[in-house]
């Protein structure tokens, strides 16, 4: 068994320092303000996926795999909110955001590559970040604030996206 000197909590990293190092490692011009809408998830041991919205309003992604960060990649879009991300099985994750049209859009990673943006509809308030959760393989829940100020919910039941329901 390792001694307590050999085992300890992972080192703490300031998020703004991490994002600065990720963005600066890219060949693009550094953003004029801190990235917004930070979200993170993990879908397996030794892996951490980080998402943010940059000055270009596109969604950006970088992954830490076995302690090393990948180069940031643009996932596109013109986000009007921060991202919400959830892993729902090993090697699978989904990211959500509200776009300028007031609809919820998503992209998902299937373990091989990113699928294109897909609209999940809705009449949502722009600028308000949705929330996402998963309580099992093939089950996703996403929550967002509607233009009516109420909370709306939509979920993936393993075969399809169930229509929006108003929660209150």
Describe these PLM feature segments.
Residues 2-168:
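A structural motif
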């Amino acid at each position: 068994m390792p001694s307590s000197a050999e085992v300890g909590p992972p080192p703490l990293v300031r998020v703004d320092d991490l994002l600065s190092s990720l963005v600066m490692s890219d060949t693009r011009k550094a953003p004029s303000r801190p990235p917004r809408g930070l979200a993170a998830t993990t879908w397996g041991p030794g892996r951490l996926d980080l998402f943010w919205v940059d000055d270009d309003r596109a969604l950006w992604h970088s992954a830490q795999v076995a302690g090393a960060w990948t180069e940031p990649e643009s996932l596109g879009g013109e986000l009007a909110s921060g991202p919400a991300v959830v892993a729902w099985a090993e090697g699978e994750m989904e990211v959500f955001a509200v776009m300028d049209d007031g609809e919820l859009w998503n992209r998902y990673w299937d373990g091989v590559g990113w699928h294109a943006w897909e609209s999940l509809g809705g009449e949502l308030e722009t600028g308000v970040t949705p929330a996402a959760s998963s309580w099992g393989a093939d089950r996703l829940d996403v929550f967002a604030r509607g233009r009516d100020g109420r909370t709306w919910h939509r979920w993936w039941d393993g075969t399809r996206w169930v229509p929006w329901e108003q929660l209150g």
